[in-house]
């Protein structure tokens, strides 16, 4: 089935190496490489442009087992089918498995046995600064975005919306891990992936406000 979006011009990135190409999973999406100064590398998103020049944006976050090749909303979550022909811009960040889309406080070296040579991930900065900058280049709104996700992405969507109310107006979570302060959650995260030890400082006491923040 042909869609309006697959015939629309490819978008761009003003950085030296950024680009968009036709998405090989969903023809109505583009696969865009955006340079992230915070992460010092190109990072990928799926992007579906609005069909009639709307500047509104919705962002959907993947779960803890997110892969580096695609965001599972685009195929398994039905985003390609659901948003086909719709007058809204859709951004699906690619990657970020077990990251909670947060800014890591520690480099992997010394805190992760399975990823000892990787640098600190800066997902929150990528989503709220680098992607927003890219959206502004495309003449999209940088306010009143909608953000949602499932599992890990659901809790992360709520946390990002709360901290960046200048960007996100609405947030939704499907089967999300919406708090990290419950007893046993830190241990559960560590058994999921040892990179969680690189994310945050120890949770601290219950009266420490930072205990309740992603």
Per-region residue spans from a language model:
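Non-catalytic cap/lid and distal C-terminal segments of serine-dependent acyl enzymes
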Residues: 1-214
